[in-house]
Design a protein with these regions (language model features):
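Active-site histidine-anchored catalytic micro-motif
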Residues: 1-227
Length: 227
């Protein structure tokens, strides 16, 4: 059995299970982005940041709280994430059977991964943090419900590649007949003032909400948004 060991544990998130849970509880207590007034019957996916938990937790925790409230918990999370290292293939699923970090071992859904029929690459995922940092949040909100992951590392992120990966996910979901949730890992704007970052990000979010794939790409390119 092949295991991918954590690469940013102790830096991007705490190095022990107890400290991870303590940090999540503290973020919940601060309630920067309350979800109590939000309504959602079914959540199919989301965009989550991959910065350290002291930053990203204030967006990620409310998302998982909302999933928890629906009571419709996925069996598999497909995590689409960038490639910061430049290593590996343009598009790749990890070939490990388990991802290990401070919250324990999380299995990969190899049935779903194989049905997606994308290339496998250990190197694409070995030192990449953008999927790893999301996983420690999951156990707190899954109510003991078993879950697995399919990390998909996307070095290329053009509309054609995005459409191709989406088609592969749709095909695989129909084939394996599982409850799947798709998570896209992105920090959106970097190194800008809050007001400027919010303004630029909103241009892209508006196109996402319209489900306008070319519009998303155009907004990113024309406004030089770091997504």
């Amino acid at each position: 059995m092949k295991t991918r060991n954590a690469t940013v544990e102790g830096r991007f998130y705490p190095s022990s299970r107890e400290k991870v849970f303590d940090q999540i509880q503290e973020i919940e207590r601060q309630e920067k982005y309350p979800v109590r007034d939000l309504q959602a019957e079914h959540i199919y996916g989301g965009v989550l940041p991959h910065a350290g938990h002291v930053y990203s937790g204030y967006q990620t925790v409310p998302f998982f709280q909302l999933i928890n409230r629906t009571g419709k918990l996925p069996g598999t999370f497909v995590i689409l994430h960038p490639n910061h290292t430049g290593s590996g293939l343009p598009l790749a699923v990890d070939e490990a059977d388990l991802w290990s970090n401070s919250i324990g071992d999380v299995p990969l859904d190899m049935e779903m991964a194989e049905a997606m029929d994308l290339p496998f690459s250990r190197l694409s995922h070995a030192h990449e943090h953008s999927a790893e940092v999301i996983i420690p949040y999951m156990p707190s909100y899954m109510k003991g419900h078993a879950f697995s992951i399919v990390p998909v590392c996307m070095m290329v992120q053009d509309p054609e590649s995005a459409r191709y990966v989406a088609e592969r996910i749709l095909h695989a979901t129909a084939e394996v007949k599982k409850e799947v949730m798709v998570l896209a890992s992105s920090d959106f704007s970097h190194f800008l003032s809050p007001s400027e970052g919010k303004k630029k990000d909103q241009l892209v979010i508006d196109e996402i909400m319209k489900k306008n794939i070319p519009g998303v790409a155009d907004a990113v390119r024309k406004n030089q948004v770091t997504i």
